């Protein structure tokens, strides 16, 4: 009996010991805000707590929050240029302890030698925070570290994550609610050429995020900026040359439950299209200038038109496309080396991704007051995006105060889409329709720059300069549409629509836009202390030259102005075997004035 009582007492003490140990090993939360004596929030201040391996770092608002073991603890706060602050706290289990340290500036430093000042890497969150802190204007920044935490694939995806910036049409940036034409885009400090034929805008989906270090959005004007914007400036910076040898490679596959391993009818990709380059089959052949054209509805020489039509790629066949998981590859190599006695570095980075996407939609136009339906048709779409690009950057440090960078970027973006449409398109006339379309958009961006950075005196004066060459090429090669009409939905009366309107009939469209931008800029800044205040004086010069060329050609199938009975698919109705002077042929849709101008040239 006595032994049993002793055992029970021992077990009680052991249990109490475990309970005490459990309570001591629990954690509470230490939260607060670090500020200076002048009321300035301190970004990047570090907090250390005795008895804990955890530490905290303040964010862009000077705030911190991290878990700390319970009990009496000492907190040490460190910030560059300020005395180390020590304070005592009592942390309770699962409770918050608020601490708002106020830091005092270092008034005197004796016997201190600064061995090395380390700058945050440009692709880190710390560098993005520092950019925002040190800027004289209102800026937001996002870094490659942020890219890795999300599903960001393109520059437009990254811009969506920045406060005050939105993306329209999946690629154009709106800053502070202002449309793309009022904003400016810069790549490594040089202006980006426009990718649009009818407006000043850049399509940000053509640059893969894997090739970038960071993106900075400037939302307010400062005297040292070029005044060609109203909303903001988007500054894109490609990967910089590393200080030590690095080599990274990644491979991944994307699965989509709606798309992957599903089979659908589509025009598909072939050959070089998998690399992001248009197939040569999509080019416009060299045509006889006597080929018929608008406003005539028929050719003066149908036999000639038929022969010219046979020069095109007349393969309209649909293929059974089985969508496989989407692959993604990336590779980066960075290495420092000696160029004579000069320090130099090289960075080579390549990114490739292909992303198919299947979607279905239903479009209904209805008067709900009378319950009358004007239109009711469905679309089945298979779109494929191919991104292929890379950067090659070289940096040469002439000495401690002079550096020259060579930055080069090539980006290829290829979007191919197949759309199959069916349903009611005109209720007033009882017209049902079937449509087949194949559209491709190709974008190529080439950017080459030489940048210089020079410091003078005790780093009070800085001179930077940029020589830039940029080129964008955008093409819509062989956009095809075939439309069929079914009066009252009767399949027996199915007809191929032939009219003078490409988008409402049957035809082909080609367009090419090429813009070259050459620019040069130089900026000078001088730092001066006047009394107790610090001032920065800046001045600069900028010049650029833009040259743009745009061409488009539209073809419709003739004889124009009627319907051709058909129960077949486009591959039979518009294939090479169907082309003849007595059956069907292409006619170029152009104005009479343009025709005369070309004949006289």
What are these regions (language model features)?
Residues 35-37, 46-50, 78-82, 96-148, ...:
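Short, acidic, small-residue-rich periplasmic hinge/interaction motif at the N-terminus
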Residues 53-63:
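Short, acidic Ser/Thr/Gly-rich low-complexity loop/linker segments typical of extracellular
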Residues 61-68, 202:
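Short, surface-exposed beta-strand/beta-hairpin micro-motifs centered on an aromatic residue
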Residues 119-122, 126-174, 189-223, 230-233:
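Periplasmic N-terminal accessory/gating domains of Gram-negative outer-membrane beta-barrel systems
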Residues 129, 224-315, 319-325, 342-345:
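N-terminal, post-signal-peptide soluble/periplasmic segments
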Residues 247-255, 346-354, 406-412, 465-471, ...:
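Transmembrane beta-barrel strands of outer-membrane/channel proteins
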Residues 298, 310-419, 446-448:
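Transmembrane beta-barrel wall of Gram-negative outer-membrane proteins
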Residues 397, 403, 441-598:
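Face-selective signature of the C-terminal outer-membrane beta-barrel domain
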